[in-house]
Amino acid sequence: MVLEKKSALLEDLIKKCGGCAVVDGGFATQLEIHGAAINDPLWSAVSLIKNPELIKRVHMEYLEAGADIVVTSSYQATIPGFLSRGLSIEESESLLQKSVELAVEARDRFWEKVSKVSGHSYNRALVAASIGSYGAYLADGSEYSGHYGENVSLDKLKDFHRRRLQVLVEAGPDLLAFETIPNKLEAQACVELLEEEKVQIPAWICFTSVDGEKAPSGESFEECLEPLNKSNNIYAVGINCAPPQFIENLIRKFAKLTKKAIVVYPNSGEVWDGKAKQWLPSQCFGDDEFEMFATKWRDLGAKLIGGCCRTTPSTINAISRDLKRR
């Protein structure tokens, strides 16, 4: 019953948005624009330690830009990662909880402000707790290869995600966002974990793709979606952090393979070299192009559209303006 009520909140938001809600954009790279140093295994999560107010500021920027869903700064925030920095388990769990609290505080403050303005066009945003892949924790680019090694089993992946999931759920987000999943094994681990923990919060699972056809592991999306399609916990499935030029084909593909809502939030088109820890020169798409893409993606059936790495509040504003134009 609780899961159904929370899923209904998301469904109502999508309806208010005219059939497609706007997810926020690149978080770590926006922190970087404001001077944060993110060349760190913890990536954006390092700001949870060093500058939490900056995290709240970035959430506010995306809300002002028209985001209907804000995603927490916990993508690369893991208990093992924090422990490796010398933090205690209690401190690590507190930082995970803080990632949700900062997003909720920003959402509530923004909504209190705009609610006093007659005729505003904003919706009360939902907060999605980000859960990055095992590869994101490894910080070696393996979320873009899907190859975790023979020693990484289904149970190991569930054990890796379990306590982080528990802490984030206890913090009370509206949604859960499993992001940049590179293979079927980890997707299945996420689904089984939600069921084992009896989680009553709707989730989406996003894969990535390096060729616009398959998961990074080489598995077909038909294979990858099989465990997701059977789960009541999974509200939406889709793609994040893939180049925009892949998205149209992938929406068409997913629409044939699932009855779940489809969520897409690509990067700017630039390519991240996980080993060299740098962005590589490549085709980059601007706000005008994202605005044009968003209409096409919505018309193809996407229910949630946003941006990932190297997209900005300006990008999200362009998407929001286009999708909410009557």
Curated annotation (Swiss-Prot):
EC number, UniProt record: 2.1.1.10
Residues the entry annotates as binding Zn(2+): 241, 308-309
Keyword Transferase in annotation: yes
Catalytic reaction list: S-methyl-L-methionine + L-homocysteine = 2 L-methionine + H(+)
Residue ranges the record marks as coiled coil: none
Regulation of this protein's activity per its record: Strongly inhibited by methionine.
Keyword 4Fe-4S part of the UniProt annotation: no
Example of a GO biological process term: methionine biosynthetic process
Domain of life where this protein originates: Eukaryota
Gene3D superfamilies: Homocysteine-binding-like domain
Residue stretches making up the Hcy-binding domain: 9-323
Keywords assigned by UniProt, alphabetized: Amino-acid biosynthesis, Metal-binding, Methionine biosynthesis, Methyltransferase, S-adenosyl-L-methionine, Transferase, Zinc
Gene Ontology MF term list: S-adenosylmethionine-homocysteine S-methyltransferase activity; S-methylmethionine-homocysteine S-methyltransferase activity; zinc ion binding
Cofactor(s) needed by this chain: Zn(2+)
Tissue expression profile of the protein: Expressed predominantly in roots. Expressed in rosette leaves, cauline leaves and developing seeds.
Function, in words: Catalyzes methyl transfer from S-methylmethionine (SMM) to adenosyl-L-homocysteine (AdoMet). SMM degradation (by HMT-1, HMT-2 and HMT-3) and biosynthesis (by MMT1) constitute the SMM cycle in plants, which is probably required to achieve short term control of AdoMet level.
Description of how the protein assembles with itself and partners: Monomer.
Listed name of the protein: Homocysteine S-methyltransferase 1
